[in-house]
Amino acid sequence: MLINPTDSDAVGNSILMANKANIPVITLDRAANKGEVVSHVASDNRMGGKMAADYIAQKTGSESKVIQLEGISGTSAARERGEGFNTGAKEHKFNLLASQPADFDRTKGLNVMQNLLTAHPAVQAVFAQNDEMALGALRALQTAGRTDVLVVGFDGTNDGIKAVEGGKLGATIAQRPDQIGIVGVQIADKVLKGEKVDSTVPVELELVVKQ
């Protein structure tokens, strides 16, 4: 069984039921917090977070004043992207002014960014753990006339890529959902054949910037 969980906690009961029925489970994109899975296929979120930090350092220099907008607390995506970004932030000696949740939501991204901008007007760059929050933050910055602040998103959604191509969003770390699906089916095929599979299979990401 291949599952792409929208909620890492809620999916647990379904996986436990599959475990009882001896049905092998493979999770895609987001990990489950309960139950046993034979393999988890997902973007290398830690690497993506680090890529975002590296890009910010490249554009604004080390020791930059940065704000991070976090995803939904407890999700593997938010945790791993945050860990990767924080690793890069330490490496580049960023001054992390604030790191607050906006729950992967565009409207919350806008509201949280408005508040953080008031509290930290010296901000030079924003890393949002998904494109929705990045676009919300972008709107808040535009409204405040702060087009000097670099914003980097994550996921490579259609809206995110459009904003990058329009010169509004600095960059987005693009997931490759087609590749996650392809690898997931390949792993399922191996499981059905009784072959050994890795417990975690990372899928590479791509930095999307304006050409």
Model-derived segments and their meaning:
Residues 2-19, 85, 98, 102-162:
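Hydrophobic alpha-helical
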Residues 3-4, 19, 24, 28, ...:
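Extracytoplasmic/periplasmic mature domains of Sec-exported, cell-envelope-associated bacterial proteins
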Residues 8-47, 58, 65, 157-165, ...:
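Flexible loop/hinge segments that line or gate small-molecule binding clefts
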Residues 20-25, 62-65, 91-96, 121-124, ...:
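Loop/turn elements at helix/coil->beta-strand transitions in domains of secreted/extracellular proteins
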Residues 41-66, 108-110, 157-160, 175-193:
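Hydrophobic alpha-helical segments within soluble ligand-binding/sensing domains
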Residues 42, 67-76, 101-103:
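Short beta-strand->loop
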